């Protein structure tokens, strides 16, 4: 093995095998030195060697060790030559490893001296099941060169079979060979993950094999199987376990196969012999290629180096000639404090000026861990481009074009107003980093059509395609056609497909003549018809039909979009896009990703579907009713979403569910949260309304329609650089904690999901004549947020432990009567003394939920209840054709008896249970009863219901004028108990002009779970205890927040008048 280091250098002349020195030699002749030519070249304090350049030959020398007892002499005459003078230093050998005398000698003295760490490797790295690779102690590791040193191998063999004795004990002969025999006797039918070679193998042999593909962005292996192969495209189809399909090229991916040796022999497969790292780079080959380059003391243009910029990892780059930069701003500034180098990075193709000390040779960087410190996909591309440069000494086409067109790029960037640093980014210590923004043309000639750029397939609008053609955004082509001024001459026309800046969803076709005149239209034919009409006017009267046939071509044909080759290219462009949201996260080598940098979708499981998705409030008003999307079931206020007309039970869909919405759900440009109430922005993107409300720089152009969202481009640059502390995604704009001394950042919707947002705080201190209310939006991090009584989900519900009967002591009877006590007429619904409440609370500890199910003659015991839970009853899903509120209401009335059942509740009395699973947003049941006035309801409660001992009062207040009395009439909905953490909520809906109180599912409700909702009992003088048993229980049924707000008098200052004494 060859090892290189900068610590110690010695000069060694190689054995002269030819009469004249040669510049390049076979790598095998260099590393395959006879054992008689081994030299002892150990130095004190280091065992890593590096050879200097000998004349024109610059090849790395392998490290040799002198082994005691091996019979190898360093003073052999074969090492001498007339052309090369051998200077051998024989320093004293330093023992770097020591063992106690009583312990047996290790298997190999060489391993004893330099190998102390052993780790197992996979089958794909070497063609052996139980082989071990050894790591050397020191500042640098042994670098594999693709072949083992013959000299070191012979040393190991001599030590293994020499039978040397130490301390009276001899090693058993052939022990290593026996261990190797055991390793080779592994089961031939056992399957292991291996890497296979693709050279000389039938492509169909891989079909049916189980594989796993490495995704660099996720740093994970995803398992699947090979299900097909396209010979025309030379791509394999991989079907992952999650059901996603993807077409990949084996040479561009990191793939392992689960096969056995028998299957490999049957399918004629071979192991991958090259040493490939986890990043997919052929490390050994790059080391050999870099070692064959001449290493000079000074760097010259064209040399490949490792360059270091402040704040970035070591990156492969090529030194660029100073003459190509011209008048480029930023790069023509010399770095102070020494010499500088102008480099261009592989992969990113950026230009930079760095100091000389910040660049090291490529071979030194490979031998150090520089290539292992970066896992970015661009770095992988850069390493592949660097490898191709080492092989063919030719730069990638884009790098060459950027170097040749440096002047044009510089002029474009100098005139750009988007770059705030005159085309360059200034770094520390005078470094300059320039990112080229010029798009490199993709040139493809088809007949007289020159395609410059294929563009990209648009997925967020359905207007960029029709039944026969696809119009990629950014498509650019050129062709020669009859001139506008002279029909006998030809002119060059440039054709482009862009996005209309006004509609943001429709394409705009532009044809530019050589004179600079542009013809725009919504279709290709609209543009070319204008050109045809112009040419016809210029034609002479004596030859009107000369160009008649040429002027009849369709606009699509002139653009080239109807050409079969162009159609195939566009189809391949659309097929190259991943087919699922999981595949969209992948960023492989050689692929261009449409996802913005740092983006990762965040999905929030909202627990409060009864609240508005915009303002996050659950109050509903007469002039601001709730609207629920009949497709995605999102809940918003009508005014919060900009809906001016009531739907009255008709079908209502949000912007993303309506016909004409984007095919793929758009992502918010302000946060990575998926879904929610979104509106278009003025620049053609989408954003959440909640994000636009919380971010200070954004606003709404039309407050009534709540769209479009404006000010996205005015958001502070520092806000885009913040990383959310909740989701950990660096994409989007973040807000910070409202505490003056806190700088914790998070996305608005992430903070809302975590309970960090204080939605509204009224500020009535208005100045001047305007009386508009100002609302402060406050949010606090976990450290500074106020103590909240927010309840946990139903999965965190705590079941009370059942007490033993012997531990229960009944309260003392103050009257002394052993049987009864007088009825307390001042109490409501029976006894309200503390003793009675304590007895009732203790009694509930023994109560279990027991739904009433008709099942013949059988006792409903606890075991029967468990069997009900375990029974497999098919879930009743709402039919997909039912969308409108009226249809859902009709379906709920017809099926609620099949879906719900009453029974004994563990909370209080009887309750309602779900016989089938329900989804969030489903209509559960309607609360029906007798509609009375509030005054009638109060009299009935005081005069009739309070005198009925053991009976409950079931009143549902709709508003200040209407109350539903379900005590003696109505459905079983009045049996639904209260809970501080409910799984349902109540809403008033309007169907065909009539109002109905509906109980909706707030979340997914499993089978046989009890239905609960928040009563929000409002009473200033009376308190009702709660027995829901949740950790966040308020302790009372009363709506404490509403009572506190009612106790405060809040009046705007504009409504106040000066008091004058009468």
Curated annotation (Swiss-Prot):
Start and end residues of each stretch annotated as Disordered:
159-184, 401-424
Q: Enumerate the residue ranges forming zinc fingers (Phorbol-ester/DAG-type).
A: 591-647
Describe the location of the PWWP domain by residue ranges.
301-365
The record's region (Interaction with PIP5) falls at 599-1062
Domain (SET): give its ranges. 898-1016
Q: Which GO terms describe its biological process?
A: abscisic acid-activated signaling pathway; actin cytoskeleton organization; chromatin remodeling; epigenetic regulation of gene expression; methylation; negative regulation of flower development; peptidyl-lysine methylation; quiescent center organization
The UniProt-reported impact of residue 1013 to A is: Deficient methyltransferase catalytic activity associated with early-flowering phenotype and reduced WRKY 70 and LTP7 transcripts levels but normal recruitment of WDR5A at target genes but without histone modification
Q: In which residues is Zn(2+) bound?
A: 980, 1026, 1028, 1033
Q: Can you give the residue ranges of the FYR N-terminal domain?
A: 441-500
Question: Pfam families under this entry?
Answer: FYRC (PF05965), FYRN (PF05964), PHD_2 (PF13831), PWWP (PF00855), SET (PF00856), zf-HC5HC2H_2 (PF13832)
List residues binding S-adenosyl-L-methionine: 908, 954, 977-978
Task: Map the zinc fingers (PHD-type) to residue ranges.
Answer: 609-660, 722-785
> What does the PTM comment of the record read?
Activated via O-glycosylation by SEC; this modification triggers FLC locus H3K4me3 histone modification, thus preventing premature flowering.
Q: Which residues form the FYR C-terminal domain?
A: 504-586
Q: Which residues form the Post-SET domain?
A: 1022-1038
Supply the InterPro entries for this chain.
ATX1/2_ePHD (IPR041956), ATX1/2_PHD (IPR042010), EPHD (IPR034732), FYrich_C (IPR003889), FYrich_N (IPR003888), Histone_Mod_Regulator (IPR050701), PE/DAG-bd (IPR002219), Post-SET_dom (IPR003616)
PROSITE patterns for the chain:
EPHD (PS51805), FYRC (PS51543), FYRN (PS51542), POST_SET (PS50868), PWWP (PS50812), SET (PS50280), ZF_DAG_PE_2 (PS50081), ZF_PHD_1 (PS01359)
Mention one GO molecular function. Answer: protein methyltransferase activity
Q: Which residues are glycosylated?
A: 947
**Entry EC number(s):** 2.1.1.354, 2.1.1.-
Q: Which GO terms describe its cellular component?
A: chromatin; cytoplasm; nucleus; perinuclear region of cytoplasm; plasma membrane; Set1C/COMPASS complex
Q: Which family does it belong to?
A: Belongs to the class V-like SAM-binding methyltransferase superfamily. Histone-lysine methyltransferase family. TRX/MLL subfamily.
The protein's name: Histone H3-lysine(4) N-trimethyltransferase ATX1
Q: Which gene encodes it?
A: ATX1
């Amino acid at each position: 093995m060859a090892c290189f280091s900068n610590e110690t250098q010695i000069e060694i002349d190689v054995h002269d095998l030819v009469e004249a020195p040669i510049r390049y030699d076979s790598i095998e002749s260099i590393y395959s030195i006879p054992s008689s030519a081994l030299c002892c070249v150990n130095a004190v304090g280091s065992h890593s060697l590096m050879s200097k350049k000998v004349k024109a030959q610059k090849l790395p020398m392998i490290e040799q060790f002198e082994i005691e007892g091996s019979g190898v002499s360093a003073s052999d005459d074969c090492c001498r030559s007339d052309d090369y003078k051998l200077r051998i230093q024989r320093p004293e050998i330093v023992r770097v490893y020591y063992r106690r005398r009583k312990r047996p000698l290790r298997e190999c003295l060489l391993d004893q001296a330099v190998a102390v760490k052993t780790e197992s490797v996979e089958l794909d790295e070497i063609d052996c099941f139980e082989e071990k690779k050894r790591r050397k102690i020191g500042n640098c590791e042994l670098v594999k060169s693709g072949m083992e040193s013959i000299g070191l191998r012979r040393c190991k063999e001599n030590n293994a079979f020499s039978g040397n004795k130490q301390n009276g004990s001899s090693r058993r002969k052939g022990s290593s060979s026996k261990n190797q025999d055991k390793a080779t006797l592994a089961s031939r039918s056992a399957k292991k993950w291996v890497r296979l070679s693709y050279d000389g193998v039938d492509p169909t042999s891989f079909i049916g094999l189980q594989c796993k593909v490495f995704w660099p962005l996720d740093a994970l292996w995803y398992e699947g199987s090979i299900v097909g192969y396209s010979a025309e495209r030379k791509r394999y189809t991989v079907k992952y376990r999650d059901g996603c399909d993807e077409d990949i090229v084996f040479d561009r991916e990191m793939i392992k196969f689960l096969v056995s040796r028998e299957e490999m022999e049957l399918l004629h497969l071979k192991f991958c012999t090259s040493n490939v790292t986890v990043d997919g780079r052929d490390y050994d080959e790059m080391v050999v290629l870099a070692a064959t380059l001449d290493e000079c003391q000074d760097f010259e243009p064209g040399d490949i180096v490792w360059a270091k910029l402040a704040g970035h990892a070591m990156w492969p780059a090529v030194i660029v000639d100073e003459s190509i930069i011209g008048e480029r701003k930023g790069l023509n500034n010399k770095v102070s404090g020494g010499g500088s180098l102008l480099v261009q990075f592989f992969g990113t193709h950026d230009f930079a000026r760095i100091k000389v000390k910040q660049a090291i040779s490529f071979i030194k960087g490979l031998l150090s861990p520089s290539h292992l410190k970066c896992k970015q996909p661009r770095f992988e591309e850069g390493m592949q481009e660097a490898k191709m440069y080492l092989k063919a000494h030719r730069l990638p086409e884009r790098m060459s074009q950027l170097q040749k067109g440096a002047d044009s790029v510089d002029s474009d960037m100098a005139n750009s107003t988007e770059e705030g640093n005159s085309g360059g980014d200034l770094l520390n210590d005078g470094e300059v980093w320039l990112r080229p923004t010029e798009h490199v043309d993709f040139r493809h000639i088809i007949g007289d059509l020159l395609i410059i750029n294929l563009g990209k397939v648009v997925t967020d609008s359905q207007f960029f395609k029709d039944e026969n053609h696809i119009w990629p955004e950014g498509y650019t082509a050129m062709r020669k056609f009859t001139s506008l001024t002279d029909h006998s001459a030809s002119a060059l026309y440039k054709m482009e497909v862009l996005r209309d800046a006004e509609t943001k969803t429709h394409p705009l076709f532009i044809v530019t003549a050589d004179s600079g005149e542009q013809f725009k239209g919504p279709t290709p034919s609209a543009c070319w018809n204008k050109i045809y009409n112009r040419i016809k006017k210029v034609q002479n009267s004596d030859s009107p039909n000369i160009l008649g046939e040429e002027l009849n071509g369709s606009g699509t044909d002139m653009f080239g979009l109807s050409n079969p080759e162009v159609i195939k290219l566009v189809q391949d462009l659309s097929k190259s896009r991943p087919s699922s949201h999981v595949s969209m996260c992948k960023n492989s080598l050689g692929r261009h990703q449409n996802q913005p940098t740092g983006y990762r979708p965040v999905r929030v499981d909202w627990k409060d579907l009864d609240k508005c998705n915009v303002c996050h409030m659950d109050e509903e008003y007469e002039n601001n009713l709730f609207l629920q999307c009949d497709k995605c079931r999102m809940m918003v206020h009508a005014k919060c979403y900009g809906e001016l007309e009531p739907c009255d039970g008709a079908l209502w869909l949000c912007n993303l569910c309506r016909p004409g919405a984007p095919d793929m759900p758009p992502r918010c440009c302000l946060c990575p949260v998926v879904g929610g109430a979104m509106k278009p922005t003025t620049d053609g993107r989408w954003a959440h309304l909640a994000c636009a409300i919380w971010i200070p720089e954004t606003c709404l152009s039309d407050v009534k329609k709540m769209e479009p969202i404006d000010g996205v481009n005015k958001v502070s640059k520092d806000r885009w650089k913040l990383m959310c502390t909740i989701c950990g995604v660096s994409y989007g704009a973040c807000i910070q904690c409202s505490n003056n001394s806190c700088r914790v950042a998070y996305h608005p919707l992430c903070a809302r999901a975590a309970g960090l947002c204080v939605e509204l705080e009224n500020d009535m201190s208005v100045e001047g004549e305007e009386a508009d209310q100002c609302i402060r939006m406050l949010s606090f991090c976990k450290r500074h947020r106020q103590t909240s009584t927010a309840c946990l989900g139903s999965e965190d519900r705590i079941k009370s432990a059942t007490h033993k009967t012997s531990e229960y002591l009944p309260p003392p009877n103050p009257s002394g009567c052993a049987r009864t006590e007088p009825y307390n007429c001042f109490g409501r619904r029976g006894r309200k003394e503390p003793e009675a409440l304590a007895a009732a609370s203790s009694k509930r500890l023994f109560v279990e939920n027991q739904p009433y199910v008709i099942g013949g003659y059988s006792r409903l015991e606890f075991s029967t209840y468990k069997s009900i839970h375990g029974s497999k009853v098919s879930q009743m899903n709402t039919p997909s054709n039912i969308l409108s509120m009226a249809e859902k209401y009709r379906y709920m009335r017809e099926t609620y008896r099949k879906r719900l059942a009453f029974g004994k509740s563990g909370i209080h009395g009887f309750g309602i249970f779900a016989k089938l699973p329900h989804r969030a947003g489903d209509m559960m049941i309607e609360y029906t009863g007798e509609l009375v006035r509030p005054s009638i309801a109060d009299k009935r409660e005081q005069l009739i219901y309070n005198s009925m001992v053991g009976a409950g009062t079931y009143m549902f207040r709709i508003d200040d004028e209407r109350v539903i009395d379900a005590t003696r009439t109505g459905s079983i909905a009045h049996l639904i108990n209260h809970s501080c953490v409910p799984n349902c909520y109540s809403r008033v809906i309007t169907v065909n002009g009539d109002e109905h109180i509906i109980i909706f599912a707030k979340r997914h409700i499993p089978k046989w779970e009890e239905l609960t909702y928040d009563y929000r009992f409002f009473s200033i003088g009376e308190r009702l205890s709660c027995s829901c048993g949740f950790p966040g229980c308020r302790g009372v049924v009363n709506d404490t927040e509403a009572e506190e707000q009612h106790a405060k008098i809040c009046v705007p200052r504009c409504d106040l008048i000066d008091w004058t004494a009468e």
